[in-house]
Amino acid sequence: MIYIGIDPGKKGAMAVIDSETIDLPVVIKFSPEAYRSILLHARGMKCTLGKEVKCCLEHVGAMPGQGVTSMFHFGENFGYIRGLLEAFEIPYELVRPQKWKKEFSITGGKNSSIEVCKRLFPGVDLRRSERCRKDDDGLAESLLMAEYARRRL
C-alpha cells in the first residue's frame, strides 16, 4: 500500500509512505514536474505491482489578508494537483487541516507540526535544502497527511 500526503500551498510539499518501508518516507517540495513524476510512478506501481494507492489532499480555502493574485496561484496549484490525481486514477480524499491535525493532537502553529513529525519520523530531514537551517512546516505537514492517510483512509 502506498500513502500520499499533499500540502497544495505555495511552499507545499508531497510525501509518500510505502507500507513496506514506513521508516523511509519520501518528501519533496512543490514542483509541477516532481509531482507529476511521483504520481506517475505511484500509478505505475498500482498497475504493475497491484499496490493500492491512497492520497490525502489538504482542502484549504482563502485566508484573511491574502491577495487576489496569491489566491489565484493557490487555486492553480490545487487544480493542477487534482488534475494529476484524476488523470493518473489515484484515489484521493480532500481533508480539512482541522481534521488531520486532530488525529495528531496538533493545537499550535506550524512548529507544532514539525515537532510531531520529528517524533513520528525521527530520521527524516525536513529542511527544504542542504543550506537551510530551519525545518520546513510544508514538508512536515505533507508527511503528517500521508501518515493520516495510512491511519484513516
Locations of regions flagged by a protein language model:
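Phosphate- and other anionic-substrate recognition elements at nucleic-acid/protein interfaces
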Residues: 1-153
